[in-house]
Amino acid sequence: MDKTMEKEYKWRADEKLLGQALLWASSRIGSQSRTINMESSYFDTADGLLKEHQAALRLRRENDRSVCCMKLRNTDTPDGMRAHEEYQCEAVSLLDGLRRLPELGAPNDLCERALAADLQEICTVSFRRCAVLLQEGDTVCEMALDEGKLRHNGKSAPLCEIELEYVAGSEDTFHALAAELAQQLDLVVEPTSKLARAMAL
């Protein structure tokens, strides 16, 4: 996989809203859904090397796949859209992923420093995702309905949220779909990432 500038909207949810969002998506032509069981472990050094660089490093089991991912913070917007650089590859371990990510465009210096450091698991996020691929004309986006648990330092909290991620086509159409979904379901923006919420426990 290659570098992408990930663009997504994120909203708070409960079981009722997840069901309503699925109905909204299912009523649209060209929707396809699949279920993925996600087990994410996030890593950093004791002195917060990745946090210092506004980066997140995770190893995630996605059904039968193991994926290493590095995200670099970019911008957030008031209406809930988040944009950040994302580099990811299939990897059997965190170290395997860190060795491969620079080939895909991830910062070589940061990956080398992380490889040489004592990386520790700082939190975990386990959830089931219902992923729905939506097509509107030539625009493709993916809606994710996530429900599970955030865990950190022996504490846990429920996770329930809706995401809409841009895949291809017109960004204007993507933003319009997000606005329609948020308005129809009266959604509230989720301003913080899964990692940030887990670390706040």
Give a label for each model feature.
Residues M1-L201:
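Phosphate-end processing signature that detects enzymes handling 5′-triphosphorylated RNA
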